[in-house]
UniProtKB/Swiss-Prot annotation:
The keyword Ribosomal protein does not apply. GO terms for cellular component: cytoplasm; DNA-directed RNA polymerase complex. The N-terminal domain is essential for RNAP assembly and basal transcription, whereas the C-terminal domain is involved in interaction with transcriptional regulators and with upstream promoter elements. It comes from Syntrophobacter fumaroxidans (strain DSM 10017 / MPOB). Residues 249-335 are annotated as: Alpha C-terminal domain (alpha-CTD). Gene3D superfamilies: 5' to 3' exonuclease, C-terminal subdomain, DNA-directed RNA polymerase, insert domain, RNA polymerase, RBP11-like subunit. This is DNA-directed RNA polymerase subunit alpha. Belongs to the RNA polymerase alpha chain family. InterPro entries: DNA-dir_RNA_pol_insert, DNA-dir_RNA_pol_RpoA/D/Rpb3, DNA-dir_RpoA, RBP11-like, RNAP_asu_C, RNApol_insert_sf. The lineage of its organism: Bacteria, Pseudomonadati, Thermodesulfobacteriota, Syntrophobacteria, Syntrophobacterales. Its EC number is 2.7.7.6. One of its GO terms (molecular function) is DNA-directed RNA polymerase activity. DNA-dependent RNA polymerase catalyzes the transcription of DNA into RNA using the four ribonucleoside triphosphates as substrates. It catalyses: RNA(n) + a ribonucleoside 5'-triphosphate = RNA(n+1) + diphosphate.
Length: 335
C-alpha cells in the first residue's frame, strides 16, 4: 500500500526570487515533481491563493449629505458611483480583529487620496496614493468608512447590516490580498530522466501579506482540506538511510600524508605506493606496508609512532570512508 506514495519522487528544491520587492512580489520554482503534478499543484494553489486568504476591505460608506449611491456630493467633481469605485481600490492591513470605522475629513480645493484616511493604529493604508475624489473650492467632505476582514469577494447585498444608520451605502468588498497569480510548468531533469515537472509560480500581493507567506498559507489550507480523505493511520517509517547513521571520522584522516613530516625515504615510499591521504594510509596493514618497495621496519616504526600521537593506527577498518575525489572536494571547500 505504502508504495503508492513512497515511490513517487518528492520535490527537493524551492527557489525564491523577489526582485527587491519581498512584500509584494515573489517567484517560486519547485522541482522535481512527478509528471502531471505541476499542473495539479499549480492550479490548486492558484485557486486557493486568489479565493481563500484573509484580507481587509471597505464594506460600507457613509457620506454627509448623501442618501444613496446615485446621488452627487456637493463640491465633489466625481459622483458617488465613481467615488465608490475608487474606494474599492484602497488596500488595507488591519492590526486588530473586528470591523473598524475610519474617516475622511477634508476642506477646500484639491485631491482626496487614500492617504487622507484617518485609520488610527488599527488600520494601515497600503496604497496612500490611490485617488478617491476631487474637491472644488469651498467644498467640505466628511466620509465614514467601515473596514472589515474577510476572504474572497463579498457582494454589496451581503454587507447590509441591521439597524445601520440612514445613508449608509454597502459596497462590494474584494478582501483577497493577492492581486495576481500565474504559473507555468516546464520539464525537469533527474539523472538521465527528463520527463519530470518543474512548477514556476509568480505571486503579486497588495503588501498586507508577503507572497512567500501567502504560498505557505495556501499549502496549509490544501493540506487541511485533504486530510479527511485519508482513511488509515499513517505510520512514521524511517528509511534505510535514516536508520544508518552517518559515520563520523577523525579529522586527521582527511589530511595529506605530506603533513606527517616524514623522512624523505618514508615519504617517497608512500608516494610510490600512491597513498595521498592519512585515511588511505591507516587502512593498510603492517604486512601490506612492508611489501612496499624500499619500505622497511624503520619507516614502519616512524609512521606508527606519528599515527599513535593522532589516535590512529595501521589496519583500521573505515566503513563508508569517502573516496579520494570526495576528500579532495572537501579540502577545496574548506580552503
Amino acid at each position: 500500500m505504502q508504495r503508492n506514495w513512497r515511490e513517487l519522487i518528492k520535490p527537493k528544491r524551492l527557489e525564491v526570487e523577489t526582485k527587491g520587492l519581498p512584500n509584494t512580489y515573489g517567484k517560486f520554482e519547485c522541482e522535481p515533481l512527478e509528471r502531471g503534478f505541476g499542473i495539479t499543484l499549480g492550479n490548486a494553489l492558484r485557486r486557493v491563493l486568489l479565493s481563500s486568504l484573509q484580507g481587509a476591505a471597505i464594506t460600507s460608506v457613509k457620506v454627509d449629505g448623501v442618501l444613496h449611491e446615485f446621488s452627487t456630493i456637493p463640491g465633489v467633481l466625481e459622483d458617488v458611483t465613481d467615488v465608490i469605485l475608487n474606494l474599492k481600490e484602497v488596500r488595507f492591513k488591519m492590526h486588530s480583529d473586528g470591523p473598524r470605522l475610519v474617516v475622511i475629513e477634508k476642506d477646500g480645493e484639491g485631491e482626496v487620496a487614500a492617504g487622507d484616511i484617518q485609520g488610527g493604529p488599527h488600520v494601515e493604508v497600503l496604497n496612500p496614493e490611490q485617488h478617491i475624489c476631487t474637491l472644488e473650492k469651498d467644498a467640505r467632505l466628511r466620509m465614514e468608512l467601515t473596514v472589515k476582514q474577510g476572504k474572497g469577494y463579498l457582494p454589496a447585498d451581503r454587507n447590509i447590516e441591521e439597524n445601520q444608520p440612514i445613508g449608509t451605502i454597502p459596497i462590494d468588498a474584494i478582501f483577497s490580498p493577492i492581486r495576481k497569480v500565474s504559473y507555468t510548468v516546464t520539464q525537469a531533469r533527474v539523472a538521465q530522466i527528463t520527463d519530470y515537472d518543474k512548477l514556476t509560480m509568480e505571486i503579486w500581493s497588495d503588501g498586507s501579506v508577503k507572497p512567500d507567506d501567502a504560498l505557505a498559507y495556501s499549502a496549509k489550507i490544501l493540506k487541511d482540506q485533504l486530510t479527511i480523505f485519508i482513511n488509515f493511520e499513517e505510520e512514521m517509517e524511517t528509511t534505510e538511510e535514516e536508520v544508518r547513521a552517518e559515520p563520523v571520522f577523525n579529522d586527521h584522516l582527511f589530511r595529506s600524508v605530506d603533513e606527517l613530516e616524514l623522512s624523505v625515504r618514508s615519504a617517497n615510499c608512500l608516494k610510490n605506493a600512491d597513498i595521498r591521504y592519512i585515511g588511505e594510509l591507516v587502512q593498510k596493514t603492517e604486512a601490506e606496508m612492508l611489501k612496499t618497495k624500499n619500505f622497511g621496519r624503520k619507516s614502519l616504526n616512524e609512521i606508527k609512532e606519528i599515527l599513535t600521537e593522532m589516535g590512529l593506527s595501521l589496519g583500521m577498518k573505515l566503513e563508508n570512508f569517502p573516496s579520494r575525489d570526495d576528500i579532495e572536494n572537501r579540502r577545496k571547500e574548506q580552503e
